[in-house]
Amino acid sequence: MKGIFLLLMLVMPQTHQAAESGNDDNSVFDLFELTGYNRKAGSRKPQGLHLVKGPDPSSPAYRIEDADLIPPLPEDKFQDLLDAIRADRGFILLATLRQAKKSRGALLSVERKDGGGHIFSLISNGRARTLDLSLSGERKQQVVSVEDAVLATGNWTNITLFVQEDRAQLYVGCNKMENAELDVPIQKIFTENLASTAHLRVAKGGVKDNFQGVLQNVRFVFGTTLEAILRNKGCLSMTNSVITLDNPVNGSSPAIRTNYIGHKTKDLQAVCGFSCDDLSKLFAEMKGLRTLVTTLKDQVTKETEKNELIAQIVTRTPGVCLHNGVLHKNRDEWTVDSCTECTCQNSATICRKVSCPLMPCTNATIPDGECCPRCWPSDSADDDWSPWSDWTPCSVTCGHGIQQRGRSCDSLNNPCEGSSVQTRSCQIQDCDKRFKQDGGWSHWSPWSSCSVTCGSGQITRIRLCNSPVPQLNGKQCEGEGRENKPCQKDPCPINGQWGPWSLWDTCTVTCGGGMQKRERLCNNPKPQYEGKDCIGEPTDSQICNKQDCPIDGCLSNPCFAGVKCTSFIDGSWKCGSCPPGYRGNGITCKDIDECKEVPDACFTLNGVHRCENTEPGYNCLPCPPRFTGTQPFGKGIEEAKANKQVCKPRNPCADGTHDCHKNARCIYLGHYSDPMFRCECRPGYAGNGIICGEDTDLDGWPNENLTCVDNATYHCLKDNCPNLPNSGQEDYDKDGMGDACDKDDDNDGILDDRDNCQFVYNPAQYDYDRDDVGDRCDNCPYNHNPDQADTDRNGEGDACSVDIDGDGILNERDNCAYVYNVDQKDTDKDGVGDQCDNCPLEHNPEQTDSDSDLIGDKCDNNQDIDEDGHQNNLDNCPYIPNANQADHDKDGKGDACDHDDDNDGVPDDKDNCRLVPNPDQTDTNGDGRGDACQYDFDDDSIPDAEDVCPENVEISTTDFRKFQMVPLDPKGTSQIDPNWVVRHQGKELVQTVNCDPGIAVGFDEFSAVDFSGTFFINTERDDDYAGFVFGYQSSSRFYVVMWKQITQTYWDTTPTVAQGYSGLSIKVVNSTSGPGEHLRNALWHTGNTPGQVRTLWHDPHQKGWKDFTAYRWHLTHRPKTGFIRVVMYEGKRVMADSGPIYDKTYAGGRLGLFVFSQEMVFFSDLKYECRDS
């Protein structure tokens, strides 16, 4: 056997390690390493311990100096350890230690975070020579001590502690200690949420219980067996006594597996090598072992042959007995021992005890080989003796003993022959040769037959507590001796039974004798599974209404058609209720007009109830074109009220019937529009909405050509400047490269930044008036006019035009030189015509307008009760906010407060063309919108599908070609105003210089509005503000969205310190001072400045804009509710989103663009849309 063990020692470590190499690293938890101590570079400096050399050179060893300073195991690692313990229902703990002599200390402990004591601790008690496991459950504490665990010797030793469920087994080195039993399973101590309430500490115990000495390789191990660990430690002789699943005495579970690689573990130690002599001896021993095994096999074969021979003899000779290995014939008698005789009777061995006679002598003895005592010849007659005394108690309490009794004789006067003592054998009871043993169950008996022959029953089996029978206070068997389980036979037959009789049916006649019937069903229960049918008849009948028939008053049909007539015995009659849809007494019934009495029974369109009355009843007309809904009909008021018609406008965007591209938004235009929806590519894409392609610069043109519908080019052609926004796609020289990115637009060899006619071929660069505009493109070549203003757009600049506005009146006699006004009306006689007078009724020739609200200071009172940007005396609806001041019938009353906007005599709530006069209300297709405004609601010649404000004739398309320049810091010697370059018919503006704060605000006014555009900084210089304004009412009152690249303090700290943070901001300006230094610094400042600016929202992520990067903003403003939301896209993704913000400071106003100290700002592909409807 020694040879086999040596061979296993050589082979097993290599195969074991090979199996382990593929495991994960959650099977071994090195407590020192998980706490943060190791010898790697960058690990923490040890606290409370000192690094020393241990017996394992591949792992660090630590001398414990102050266990209180050693940090606990991190909570997440402790939780992983708990999960492993609970999964395996136990653990294996390995530790190498050198403990101070006769000291007491904890190897590890789990202590409560709130200082409530220990939940688990492992303590080596050097004086008591024990290893103590202390456990604290919910209501119980237990201390389990493993005796003779001598660890505190001052020398190196190692321990292996195996805990499984409620059993614990300890090995000190290779020596197995006694097993210990826990009151509760270990997983009930290491609970699932223990890591949140307790710490695991190494070497930390209670008061004066900290470990004293050196520790190494303190590890919890999972995923292997105790046998594998002992084998790898060289403890081969112990492998048959470890706790395993196959050892039923220990009761452990099979949760521990057979691998042993884990959390950053070192390779397992292999068995030491062997010399050639050792191997020669090994094989010699194995040869000897083979000879021994062969001999044992021959002996077993011989014994088997003997047993077979005995079995044959017993079979051939009936009645024989086999006793103590000896075969006896029937009726043979033999002696077993000196006191037992046996007889064979028909294969049954019957033994009996020998009965011994009384011995009248004192020297009676039991000879060898005999059972009864004998007297020797020296005894004589009993003359002259006293009577015998009583027998003494038996000399033994069980088995064979003796009793004695005595008598007396006067030997001086009498011969006294005979013995004075008699002896006899005795046996109170047989000695109990049994031993204490617990009971064990026999095998289960076969299952009994089912307890029923049909239906549901049960079968039973039993077992007896006789394998073995419990004796000498041994434990009874645990569990039940009887077991039942259900059994199912074929369903039992069910005989049918009659159910209850039905009520008698109506008599066949009302008089004169008729018949009526009743029925019953064979269903209580119905026959099933070959059961018998019900006995008897299923029907019954009887005579009814035996009385004589009276005269029938209903024969003359006195009631209304369809009304029930009831006659009585005396000849009278009575009519029932009128049929549905009629009203009356039953004799006379009139049709009910449900359409009139239930005015909302059917859909009402433009004040017309689409209901038709019929006799009887009513029916609704089908829903109008572009509406969906039911077409109910019915009879009577109740049905008309309960089943009303609902017609809803069709919405392809909502019902999914649109054909927009997956990267496009479906925009619902209304059910009167044709088409009813528009597809618009999402930010980062461009196209016609049906097809969308990548759009890097977010200017609405794709990076590559798209295959749109035939002859469709808008937004389907490739972007001629794919990396620089140019929504107008201007290309003067038609070279395929847009002007925005073409360095020589006119191909005259002069680069644009030096070309005085950027779009006109002029290599000579002649410039007579020295205004930096070449003569070839100068609209006033002999007059200095660098701005090239041309009010009447006739090609002749204002600087050299004798009639700037083209109204036929020379400039020196024109009271509105820049506004077309043939009538030259001047109501206030101030020399400024009414068409351009900012106070047409107040004499103010200087035309001062301090707050840039287009109202001269002379007549500007800033009293605006509805906060819509129009002072009360100039507001066409002073008490109802209407920033757009729409008044389509020009009656001086705004549409918002006018009940007949087009003045055609039809009220707005019934007018099928609210903004276009059509007193005839002609609606050919019956869809609810009149022919006069079918596809152009405001009659501005722009179809609703293309109209940005389909309910405002004044606004049809996005256009910033005309705008008002508003400086916000107009004072100072070094004033630099913004320089705005307009492109793409007013849909793209570029601000080119580093300037003071200013706004380019358009003249269109809005209430509810959506405003979007592309933002692009085309320079690396500067890092300041740019953005846009909305709700503009004056230079002191507006909302502004402004964006800064980096956080920066404004250079001028007067009058206030202004700290501008990077990121997007939404602010409301309500300045008491107006444009100037106060407003300038307040705008720069991110935060609130009393009396100037209030910040509604600032991007919490403080993301600044990046150079040469396209962004797309989308503003939603609904003044009625105060809703404001700004979303900023970077490419396809949302970069910042303000979410819903509510502020009702201003009820609408104008839109514009904002800059503050930032040059080369591109505002491209600008779009605004009214959302008042």
UniProtKB/Swiss-Prot annotation:
TSP type-1 domain location is: 382-432, 438-493, 495-550
- What are the VWFC domain coordinates in residue numbering? 319-376
Q: Where are the transmembrane segments?
A: none
Task: Extract the signal peptide range.
Answer: 1-18
Output the Gene Ontology terms for molecular function: calcium ion binding; heparin binding
Name assigned to this protein: Thrombospondin-1
Disulfide bond sites:
174-235, 394-426, 398-431, 409-416, 450-487, 454-492, 465-477, 507-544, 511-549, 522-534, 554-565, 559-575, 578-589, 595-611, 602-620, 623-647, 653-666, 660-679, 681-692, 708-716, 721-741, 757-777, 780-800, 816-836, 839-859, 877-897, 913-933, 949-1170
Q: Which residues are glycosylated?
A: 155, 158, 250, 363, 705, 711, 1070
Please list where the region (Disordered) is annotated: 838-935
Q: Domain TSP C-terminal: where?
A: 961-1173
Residue window of motif Cell attachment site: 929-931
Compositional bias of kind Basic and acidic residues: 886-897
Q: Which Pfam families match?
A: EGF_3, TSP_1, TSP_3, TSP_C, VWC
Organism (species): Xenopus laevis
**PANTHER family (UniProt xref):** THROMBOSPONDIN, THROMBOSPONDIN-1
